[in-house]
Amino acid sequence: MMRSHADDSAEARPAPAMSVGVFIPIGNNGWLLSENAPQYRPSFALNKAITLKAEGYGLDFALSMIKLRGFGGKTEFWDHNLESFTLMAGLAAVTTRIRLFATAATLCLPPAIVARMAATIDSISDGRFGLNLVTGWQKPEYDQMGLWPGDAHFANRYDYLAEYAQILRDLWETGASDRKGAYFQMNDCRLSPRPQAPVKIICAGQSGAGLAFTAQYADYNFCLGKGLNTPTAFAPVVEKLAEASARTGRRVTAFALFMIIADETDDAAMATWAHYRAGADAEAIAWLGAQGAADTRSGSDTNVRQLADPASAVNLNMGTLVGSYASVAAMLDAVMTIDGVEGVLLVFDDFLKGLDAFGTRIQPLMRSRRHVTAAALPEVA
């Protein structure tokens, strides 16, 4: 078995409890730009099955992204996408425990409308709803609708998002906003009913500006895991988040995004990973690279720069954990050795099979999930 980055002596210490979420495939083919990976279109039926399975295995939350234009290529990567809020509203009606996060494309949706949609899904879910805020980095998504504000947005996008988040908080917490800024002007805007539970905000900032925004306005930060079987390589981003949070006096914890490719043995899992890499969709990857290069205003530390790095663009350069079920369990436990990390957000090469493997083969081996496996879980469909 491949050893994790956790020290062997950690076996004797209680492991911090890990929260686990699933990044459901709202777009076709999930997160693999490969002709050799499973090919499928998104549907409510698929995402319902995934989310119910995740709930049955005791996962803590499900998150859907928003993507309004794909990358093309032979696999038509992300050319076929559902819409995040309406999908999560449907899932809210058929689940009972798992928390649900939708993603707001803030260049398309006014904050007062998002506040009301969130309050509605809060009602459907009985307080289980949260919100992921994104600034919008891929110009063709918005330019096709005449909504791109100009390339200056690359530099001022977090100023825009700060006003947006302030209006959301005004409406959710007080039911009214009269806030007037550079981007939005509220005129005694009202919201009722308000959410019954606090709506948690998450952000995926990795740059200095993104982390500063998260520390001021969000409750959680999603970090991209890094590398192949290097579960703690993203730790410097968490350290920067802690520094930013110290300046605001707020507690903001991190979740790391990882792709899981697991099998009975390390060699079998690595063979699958090699097969996916061999089928990389070069045309779609080239589109991703071109869009990432379009932002000449931001620094080199943005999420987009990592996503578009040619090194492993076949899965958007997210952290990838490949190995036997035991190896993957150990590597996931290692994530929780980083101070300030609350958990992980997982994607799978095949979501239904992958969740079954996680729930029955990986999670039972994880010290950081003993609070789940020690409890009796409902039967999984």
From Swiss-Prot:
Reactions catalysed, as given in the entry: uracil + FMNH2 + NADH + O2 = (Z)-3-ureidoacrylate + FMN + NAD(+) + H2O + H(+); thymine + FMNH2 + NADH + O2 = (Z)-2-methylureidoacrylate + FMN + NAD(+) + H2O + H(+)
Key words of the record: Flavoprotein, FMN, Monooxygenase, NADP, Oxidoreductase
UniProt xrefs under SUPFAM superfamilies: Bacterial luciferase-like
Top EC category: oxidoreductase
Gene of this entry: rutA
Family the UniProt entry places it in: Belongs to the NtaA/SnaA/DszA monooxygenase family. RutA subfamily.
Glycosyltransferase found in the keyword field: no
Protein name: Pyrimidine monooxygenase RutA
Gene Ontology biological process terms from the UniProt entry: alkanesulfonate catabolic process; nitrogen utilization; uracil catabolic process
Coiled-coil annotated spans: none
Biological source species: Methylobacterium radiotolerans (strain ATCC 27329 / DSM 1819 / JCM 2831 / NBRC 15690 / NCIMB 10815 / 0-1)
